[in-house]
Amino acid sequence: MQARLQAIADGVDGTFGLVVADLAGQHRFEVNADRQFTQASCIKTPILLEVLKQAHDGKLQLADRRWVEKQDKTGGSGILAELGDRTVELSIDDLCVLMIVMSDNTATNMLIDQIGMENVTATMASLGCEQTVLRRRMMDTAAAARGEENLSTPADAARILRLLHEGTFVNREVSNHALSILRKLKSGAIRSTVPQSVSVAFKPGELPGLLTEWALVELPERPYIVVVMGTYNPRSSTDDDLDAAMKQVGKEAYKFFKGRK
């Protein structure tokens, strides 16, 4: 299995990192697991966790409502930027759902402003995920031009997903709330390699030259994690090439774990 995954990574004209980890046994396979990658929308998972942690700590209420103001709106993915100014009032929990399911950048920035960028990074460090850092809001082109990117590693992402599966991010209730939102997504490279009857809690991300995906595949009796992060050379490759490599990893993982007990 390790050799097959390494061959997939070696076939990418760029940099490719992955973790495939067994949650019911000891199997774990890695390639570039400790390498930092820009996360694109996958950084929204740590943001979600910080929101839920602060709700548990009494710093905010998930039922609290926020108007979507003109100054909140930002471009890129999502729907809130297309709506009228101050015509929509949403709960913090609803903003979380929009951030994950629609990857809504306006909802994401509203949540970052609510919880504090530095708190996301601090919480990740407290979990042993020191390489996972939130350094800018969504669509902040000036910060991006300065090289301030939101980062993580395959190993950190796998650790975060394991904590959610085990119910040890804050507690079982908070972990389950996060998973319930992450399960709402329908389309992703790893998701596509698993039968629809199998639940997958996941978040994909995409930027020019970059694809990422964090996935917890809840295969009955044999749950497992697949994290893939990759960049490619746009002069010789495309999104489709990297997406195909990610799907190969997902197929290998499903084939490996299916039927194991």
Question: Which role does the model predict for each range below?
Answer:
Residues M1-I8, R28, Q114-G116, R159-G188, ...:
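Structured C-terminal helix/loop/strand segments within mature extracytoplasmic catalytic/sensor domains
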Residues M1-R35:
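Beta-lactamase-like hydrolase cores
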Residues T15, V88, N109-L161, H165-E166:
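Mid-domain, small-residue-enriched loop/turn segments at the edges of structured enzyme/sensor domains
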Residues G17-A21, E30, P46, W67, ...:
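Soluble periplasmic/extracytoplasmic beta-strand elements of cell-envelope proteins
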Residues A21-L23, K70-Q71, I100-S103, Q114-I115, ...:
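Active-site-proximal beta-strand/loop segments in catalytic clefts of secreted hydrolases
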Residues L23, L62-G78, I115-G116, I181:
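Acidic helix-start/capping segments at beta-turn-to-alpha-helix junctions
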Residues Q26, T38-R66, V226:
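Active-site SXXK
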Residues K73-N109, M117:
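Conserved catalytic neighborhood of penicillin-recognizing serine enzymes
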